[in-house]
């Protein structure tokens, strides 16, 4: 009996140091996976699936679930074409239902109040995913920082403005859905991260390339006041050489794209297409399967973020000039000669 009690006494401290694999969030209980002392929670829904009537709308709250939800596999990547050769993903699936985040935490209890890092992937706002191995947060977690990656809508699904879409909103604007997804992800983290051992008042947002562009956009957005404490961006900003498109300019590009898609649909089906179908009704575009819409949009679906009057109310450079951005410490950087190949090739493909 003494030996048994002694064994239990030795085991109790070790059990206290075991990773916390079950966590209760606002939506329900999640079960993660122990990874040699840290816990990984993958595929956590931070918003409702943006499908059907929610296509081209601001993200809506995630749905609650009963029982324990396994969070051991990545959720689907955002819809995208394989346009960058250096991208590998933790899951092969691409889907319009993509609003998931992943958490690597070293915390053993919810009382540790560890610093939190949220990373937004690069990819020109057209490609990329939080499941990419290069963004895995285990190394950061082993240094005592809760590391998070979050997906957001890309391409035509995340940055499509149109007059009919603008009529649907209270602010009479459209587009920027990918940026709004990022806001929703940060808000979810702020609301729930204490359960994972994190400090909601010590959130740092980080990004590279398009992720860095996102960081600058988020800092300039009135929707982000009070959501994060620090920001880091590398190799990208929305405050570049050109001004951001106005709502009217973005809508005009959206109408042109919708018309081109309609014309392609007409050629494939043999039906005649009305001249202004791109200006009239978006029901057909909303009803298209995601794969078909992406194929029809093609390279013309280059993301056009804009001054929508909601996420972005004025040019970010003006917001910063007036000191009205989210006032937090900002670390920015770039890479040595990162633009040299583009300058030499002048946009041409290497041979």
Predicted regions and their residues:
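Bacterial Sec-dependent N-terminal signal peptides
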Residues: 1-21
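Alpha/beta-hydrolase active-site loop
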Residues: 98, 171-194, 249-257
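Surface-exposed acidic, glycine-flexible loop patches that form ligand/cofactor-binding
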Residues: 105-113, 191-199, 222-225, 319-325
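Non-catalytic accessory segments of hydrolases
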Residues: 20-176, 200
């Amino acid at each position: 009996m003494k030996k048994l009690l002694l064994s239990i006494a030795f085991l109790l401290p070790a059990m206290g140091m075991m990773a916390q694999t079950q966590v209760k969030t606002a939506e329900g209980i999640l079960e993660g996976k122990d990874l040699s002392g840290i816990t990984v929670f993958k595929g956590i829904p931070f918003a409702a699936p943006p499908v059907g009537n929610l296509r081209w709308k601001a993200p809506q709250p995630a749905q609650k679930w009963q029982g324990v939800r396994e969070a051991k596999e990545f959720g689907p990547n955002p819809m995208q074409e394989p346009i960058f050769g250096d991208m590998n993903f933790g899951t092969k699936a691409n889907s319009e239902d993509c609003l998931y985040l992943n958490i690597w935490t070293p915390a053993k209890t919810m009382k540790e109040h560890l610093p939190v890092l949220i990373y937004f992937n690069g990819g020109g706002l057209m490609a990329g995913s939080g499941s990419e191995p290069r963004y895995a947060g285990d190394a950061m977690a082993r240094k005592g920082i809760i590391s998070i990656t979050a997906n957001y809508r890309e391409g035509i699904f995340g940055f499509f403005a149109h007059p009919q879409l603008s009529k649907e909103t209270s602010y009479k604007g459209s587009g920027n859905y990918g940026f709004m997804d990022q806001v929703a992800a940060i808000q979810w983290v702020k609301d729930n991260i204490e359960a994972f051992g994190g400090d909601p008042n010590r959130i740092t947002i980080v990004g590279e390339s398009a992720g860095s562009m996102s960081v600058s956009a988020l800092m300039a957005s009135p929707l982000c006041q009070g959501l994060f404490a620090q920001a880091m961006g590398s190799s990208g900003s929305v405050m570049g050489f050109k001004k951001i498109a106005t709502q009217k300019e973005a809508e005009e590009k959206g109408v042109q794209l919708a018309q081109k898609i309609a014309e392609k649909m007409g050629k494939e089906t043999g039906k005649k297409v009305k001249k202004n179908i791109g200006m009239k009704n978006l029901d057909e575009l909303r009803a298209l399967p995601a794969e078909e819409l992406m194929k029809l949009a093609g390279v013309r679906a280059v993301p056009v973020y804009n001054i929508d009057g909601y996420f972005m109310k004025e040019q970010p450079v003006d917001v910063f000039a007036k000191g009205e951005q989210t006032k937090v410490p900002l670390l920015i950087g770039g890479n040595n000669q990162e633009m040299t190949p583009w300058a030499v090739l002048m946009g041409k493909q290497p041979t």
